[in-house]
Amino acid sequence: LTEEVREKRGLSYSVYSQFAPGLNAGAFAISLQTRPDQAAEALKVSRQVLERFVADGPTEAELQAAKDNLIGGFALRIDSNRKLLGNVVNIATNGLPLDYLDGWTDRIAALTVADVRAAMARKLQPQRMVTVVLGAQP
């Protein structure tokens, strides 16, 4: 997203996506801020990037960078009582084993491109997504 929306086209200063998985479909969002006259193009490019990513999945290099980021930042996910409680809620809500956090980094390290592609195909269906745009009319 950053490469296509920000770097190549200059449509937004920042663009990011996030997925909040759960027992059901979960929520996926792409967020960006852009000028009203660029909103349609930014939305179009974002959708194209998402559809391509769901179809092709990440490259080995992209997956390794994501894994390095997640594993390297793991300590920051549990560095306060609030964050620990959030993890406990996640474990309870999703029926995960009590030792879920103990093996988290090992499970992330073991992920393959095929694993990610399969998960993307199961969880992300661009044709079923709802688009919400907030802002002024161009």
Placement of each model-derived feature along the sequence:
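Bilobed periplasmic-binding protein-like "clamshell/Venus-flytrap" ligand-binding domains
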Residues: 115-133
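M16 family metallopeptidases and their MPP-like homologs
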Residues: 2-110, 127-135
